[in-house]
Regions:
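Radical SAM enzyme [4Fe-4S]-AdoMet core and its adjacent flexible, acidic
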Residues: 14, 29-43, 51, 104-194
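Conserved alpha-helical substructure of the radical SAM core
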Residues: 1-113, 124, 128, 132, ...
């Protein structure tokens, strides 16, 4: 940044250390680990982080392990990224708390990409692997993304899919569930991280 005046860092921000799901492959499913992962950044603290770092950020990713939609100031955080001219702002979420209104406000305020965690493309597998998740809410969110992309065609949808023996066969169903709005598919093998 100092020499060329270019942005070069990615900032990965979890504004809250909590999750509404208990996915089988995630550390938030481990009760002991969950007890040690607590806390919420106040918006004022996020503003201080932004003042120190966002002017050098090439990308701001909100949510990188926890569930950012649990933070009451989510849209303000996204807008803060754009206020500092961060070129690319993304949100990683399970999506079950992301209403059409909240998503529309986030995109209007500068959200460039939505990364949705989905570990099954049938109700049975989705709800088994993503404990507390509702497949109907996931499908409703995908319909909302389709609507929002009509107004904001540059808005991107990424699906994060953790592959395991329970869901590998369901990858063939991705197009019937997600449709043509998918821009990026992120695949990774399951691993025990908790």
């Amino acid at each position: 940044f100092h020499v060329l005046g270019k942005r070069y860092i990615g900032i990965f921000l979890d504004p809250v250390l909590a999750c509404n799901f208990r996915c089988k492959m995630c550390y938030f499913s481990d009760e002991q680990k969950r007890k040690s992962l607590r806390g919420t950044l106040k918006y004022e603290e996020i503003e201080a982080i932004a003042g120190s770092l966002f002017h050098r950020a090439l990308k701001l990713q909100v949510g990188c392990g926890a569930e950012p939609t649990l933070h009451k100031d989510l849209v303000k955080i996204i807008a803060l990224g754009k206020r500092y001219n961060v070129p690319y702002v993304s949100l990683t979420t399970n999506g079950n708390l992301l209403t059409k209104e909240l998503l529309a406000a986030a995109v209007k305020n500068g959200l460039d990409e939505l990364t949705l965690s989905a570990h099954g493309f049938t109700r049975e597998t989705y709800e088994y692997l993503m404990t507390n998740g509702k497949f109907d809410l996931f499908c409703k969110l995908l319909a909302n993304v389709t609507e929002i992309k009509k107004q904001y065609p540059q808005f991107k949808l990424r699906i994060n899919y953790t592959i395991n023996n329970n869901n590998i066969e369901e990858l063939s169903r991705i197009w019937e569930v997600v449709g043509d709005e998918l821009d990026i598919l992120q695949l990774r093998p399951i691993q025990k991280i908790g």
